[in-house]
Amino acid sequence: INDVLVNTSNVQGFVKYSVTSKLGNCAGGTTEYIVRVNPLPKPDLIDGHICVNESTGVTYQAYVLDAQLADPNFTYDWFMLNTVTNTYDALPSANGSTYEATQPGTYQVTVTNTVTNCKQTDQATVITVYPAIAFTSIVTEAFTNDATITITVNPVGTGSLIYSLDGGAWQNSNIFTGVEAGTHQITVEDTEGCTHLTETVEVIDYPKYFTPNGDGIHDYWKIVGLEAKHNAKIYIFDRYGKLIKQIDPLGDGWDGKYNGQNIPSTDYWFKVDYTENNQQKQFKAHFSLKR
């Protein structure tokens, strides 16, 4: 009799096997065997990715494969799938519970218990992720507290991009709506951790009033968010249409004076000619001077 007893349940501990020999309808004697069932190592590799500069091919962020075992009686042998021969090649000097992968591919670890000689293998796949390189922001609906910022990433990379406004919650959409006037920070990342880009964006608006009384608070009237690229010209008028002041859009603003003299508290009108997304635009409105 020559047979192999296989324990398919993987029950740990001691197992009793009863073996009865038979020949035709004739049964022989029964022999009992006590077999010790040792636990198998249970490596648990997790699929991951490496970050690679697409233009240079250089890996700038490796991925650490972890067998997630710490038994001092375990040894580790690491392999990588050779896609030409479809066999696993041993990775030299890779004998720890972790391995730092710098190339994409399928990896395998064989863990051996040196006391019981039980061994188990596990595999994981490591893929390449190329980062996004840069992005541009387009602001529409200026002069409102309901502006829209649209983000365009180029090159987009291969990661799953997410977007954040002013350090707020991450979102999958590249469009932010209802954005208030002022300076904002846009952050673009990917969920794989290969991309991290930031940029400041200005949303244009104007203060509805100012109080030029020298207390350092709202002493100047100035349009918020204008930059040199807007090529803006700002004109301030009184209620009769008389030009009071032309102000520098990048300067401090208007101090509430005409020819060096304070002028009355009342409403004043302004006109701003500017460029938004390569289109010439004009905006008119009024604000209050309060003393």
Regions inferred by a protein language model and the residue ranges of each:
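Solvent-exposed loop segments of extracellular immunoglobulin-like
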Residues: Q68-N82, N86, V156-G167, H230
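Short beta-strand segments within Ig-like beta-sandwich modules, predominantly Fibronectin type-III
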Residues: T87-N95, L165-G178, Q246-L250
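Short loop/turn motifs at secondary-structure boundaries
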Residues: T198-R291
